[in-house]
Amino acid sequence: MEWAYYGSGYSSSGTPSPVGGDGDEDSYMTVSSAPPKRRAGRTKFKETRHPVYKGVRSRNPGRWVCEVREPHGKQRIWLGTFETAEMAARAHDVAAMALRGRAACLNFADSPRRLRVPPLGAGHEEIRRAAVEAAELFRPAPGQHNAAAEAAAAVAAQATAASAELFADFPCYPMDGLEFEMQGYLDMAQGMLIEPPPLAGQSTWAEEDYDCEVNLWSY
């Protein structure tokens, strides 16, 4: 089956077609104009979705996966695992245009012009091959990929060092004195709830009732 260039002036038959307003990149929605919805509330699971690209998730460190859902069904089309998030995002754009046409929401506004898209109604395998082919066009050179990874690691190391220096400026004082003072307050409060002990030499006869008379004065 022949390919169709959306926005490039070619139809599925391979013959040139007039370029009109429908072929403009502005006719497609993008994640910047219609960002994907996020579930509200707190989540206990680890978030794997890319914060910007639609249809892209992180699988392992340095790996990104992409899958798309059929417009009128629950079935998903697995597009593959890619080295960069941009490669996975480009694969998503190809599959989205092949499945939804002008109603597709793209990650990049220039995808209709730069990517080769199967015609509407193409099978899953054909869409997957086109998505992988589009992703390979944006594979970074080995040196560029390593440089980007090293730059990210350097930024993380600098942030860690800055945090360590920040906490080093604020010394941590021992809490022994404060704990001792608090224990004294606790002992005082406990002592107020206990009856004081009798004084030395004090008799307990006053607590008993006696019927006898006692002479208070003696002459």
From Swiss-Prot:
Location in or out of the cell: Nucleus
Composition bias type Low complexity, residue spans: 1-19
Entry keyword annotation includes Transcription: yes
Encoding gene, per UniProt annotation: DREB1E
Family: Belongs to the AP2/ERF transcription factor family. ERF subfamily.
Protein name from the UniProt record: Dehydration-responsive element-binding protein 1E
Residue numbers spanned by region Disordered: 1-44
SUPFAM superfamilies named in the record: DNA-binding domain
